[in-house]
Structures are given as structure tokens and as C-alpha cells.
Amino acid sequence: LKLFNAHNITVFDSSDKMCYSSCDATVLQNGDIMAIASFRSGRNFRVTNEFNGLAMKISSDGGRTWGVEQIIYKGSNWEPQILQLPDGEIQVYFTHGGPKIQPQMEAGIPESEMVPSSGTAIIRSKDNGKTWDPYVMEPPYAAHRVSQQYAYTKKGIQVFTDQMPCAILLNNTDTIALAMESMFVRDGEDVLYITTAYSDDNWAVGLGIDEEGPADKQENMWHGAAPYLRQFPSGETVLSYNQKRFQIRLGDSLAREFGDPIDPMHGTGFWGSLELIQSHIVVGTMTYARKVSGQQQNRIMISQNVLNHRIDAPRARIRVDGDNTDWDDATDALFVGSDSQAQAAVRPAKDDDNLYFLVERLDTDLSDGDTVELYLADSGSDTLDTNTLRLTVGPNGLTGAARFNGSDFAEIDAGGIQAAMTLQGTIGNDEDEDTGYLVEVAVPRSLLRISNQQLRWNVLLRDRGTDGRVTEDILGTIRWNVPGDWMPLTVD
């Protein structure tokens, strides 16, 4: 489906082409899909703003058919992004270049001598896209400016930056967090940084054409381009950007403090985006720029990234019977599995007598060596000690329970531990494709020392390949034998 199709147009009595780029889409609260793309005239982009702008299409049947294309803004722009607020207001953020370039167009300045400037602006709709405010169809092509940063002055023109915007409404707040790319010229080269801005009043007051803002802002935090910002339901924010390679940083619930970058993709390219597909899973995408036999043959790279964090075990009534239907209200889990073909999710729950764990493993080739190890330690212990318990499950159910004795893990009587499993596949049969297994485990609280209502826990996955080699998957960079590194689990 070609949603926005390039087509021939006439500009100043000469042939030209309408071109589209940077489409963004979202599912609105009423179920419609809204898609918005930047458009421009191919030959006259820097001659007139009349044929530059934002185009919108809406589908009311899940994308099977689309309504007519509507122009919702005119003026030079790039990279629209859609955000809908809880009250239904739709905001379109975009790189705002029209007002600064318009006087230069009117003066007939050649494109090679023009001084472009950017910044981020928005237009709003409160009726699902029927009308827009401001409704900009003529000079000076000024929308509602929300962020711009002074870069330099050239030919008497103040040049601003802050572009490629991506905004979110932070969970359970009235604060909008906005990530942008900021571009400067250093020694004749473009240098790009990542900037964030914030608004607690829904950008109530717009900026003037030569005004910096907003006041609440973190400018030029790291080198990078094309940022994208998302937030998990549990509060953690995640910020991606491009620095030839796709970078991701995990942030706090206010999108102000971010950790070190990770590099989930191995190719180099440009642009990029993030999208949540589950409560703990975010998908990153980026163009993979490559040449094959001297020809440019770009591809799209995709990475699935899983969030692991502190979990509060919910109170639940669990029957240990190998069936996960009791776990509908216990959805938080630790996820492990990136180096092998297998993946596992482990969910906790609790009652007054036991802690419960549901291990769900996806595995297309089951063998006896395909185990998941669950480690439990007292929250007051930074090192392995006699309060550290290790449970091992596999396609045959619970296969081991051991306690650290000061030098190694020694098996203990597992009689008080309940376990039940469901197998989806055949063990050791290379001729079929398996699905995996499910194991429920109930651990008596009497086997655990729990300080400050909290444990530390860790998961390790082992996958035995058809060649007999075993691959170990761990939780990121967590050390399996250092409880101080493990994830907190609140159980009281």
C-alpha cells in the first residue's frame, strides 16, 4: 500500500513533482488510524512554501481503506510526530523551517545562498483531525513554536536549531517531555546533539521567531541525531538516537536522567524509531545503509529490547498444576534470552505461606539440557551466602534445589517445594519443531530469609544445541554470582 503517492504538479507554469517523506502514524482514542507525512515540491522546495507542508490521511477500518488526503499545514518542515493527550487533543510536532526561509524566498535569494533555520513547532486538533489550530496556509507559515535554541548568526539572520522532535506525555503527570536533535557548525562540519525539553502547561505560550526556549530544558547532552522517546507503563523512559549506530539509553520516570547507551544492532545507518509492543518490550528500528557490488541497497534493522526492573510480587491464589490461567493478574516478569534461540519469562506471585514462580520458556528444539536457573537471595546480601537458593527447572519440571554452602551450591531436600509442568514438544527429537515448556514452582517462605520485605533474584537460561554446545543467557550485564547485582523483588 502506497499511502502517500508522489505525483506530478505544476509550479509557476512548469512541471514539478510532489514528494512525501517522514510519515508518522498513531491509533487515535476513537480507533481511527491517523497518518501524517511531510510533503514538498521536488524542484521548488526553496522557491515557494506554497507546495511544502503536512498531509494527513485517516483510516476508520484498521488500515484497510483510507480517506482522502488533507493538507493540514503549509510551510517548509520535516519529520512530523503525532501525540494524543488523554483529553483527546492531538498534537503534531515537526521541524519548523518555514518562517525563517519565507522572507528569503520572497527576496528571490538563490537556494545556494539561503540561510536555513529550524526549531520545533506544533499544531493541534481537538476534533480528531477535522480542524487544526493554528491553521497555517499562508505566509509567514508560522505554527506554535515550542522549542528552539540559538546556534549562530549568518548574513544577519539568527539561526536556530532543535529539530526531529519526538514527544510523550509522562505517565501520571501533566508533563510533556520532548526529545530533539540540535545541530551546530563546528570547523565547517555539522555537529549533532540530543536535547530534551519539558512543559507542565501544554506549551501554553509559544516562542517568538527569535526567542530561545523553553526554560525547562536539557541542551546538547550527547552527540547524536534523530531521537525517539518512549515510556514503559512501569515508569522507565527509553531514549534512542543515531550516532552512525543505533543507541538506546534507559531513563528515569521524568525523562531527565539517563544511563549509559547500549547498542542493540550491529549495522550502521541513519534515522531510527522506538515503539512499545508489550508492557516490557520496546522495538527499535533503523535504516541499515549498505552497498552491495557498489549499489546502494538499504534495509531496515529491527531489535526487540526487553525491560527488566524491580518487581512487586502480587498477591494471588495459585494452584500449582502446570496451567498459567491463575496468573492473569500477575504480569510483571523478568525476561532472558538473546544469545540463544530460546527465551524465558519468569513471573512471581505470593501468598502468606509461599512465593510462586511461573517459568515460561520458548524453545524450538528441546533437550534435557535446556534449563532455567532461578536464584533467590536475601536483599541484605551483596554476595553469595547460606541464604542464597538456586532452583533449576527444565522440560522435565523441577530438577534441582540447592543452597550455597560457602563454596558451592549443595542440593537440599526439595520436599517442601511444589512444582508442576506442561511440555509443548518432544525432548531430544530433532525432526520436529517444539514450542517450549511451562513450569510452576511454589517455594515455602520458611526456606528463605527476607529482609526489609525484599529479595534479590536472578535468572539464567541454558540452551543445549544440536551439536551439544551449551549457550548461557543472562540478564544484561548482571553477574550470576553477585546478588548485589540482581533485581529487587518485593514480597511483603
How would you describe each model-predicted region?
Residues 1-19, 26-76, 84-157, 169-220, ...:
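Beta-rich carbohydrate-recognition and catalytic domains
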Residues 42, 166, 273, 444-447:
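A generic secondary-structure signal
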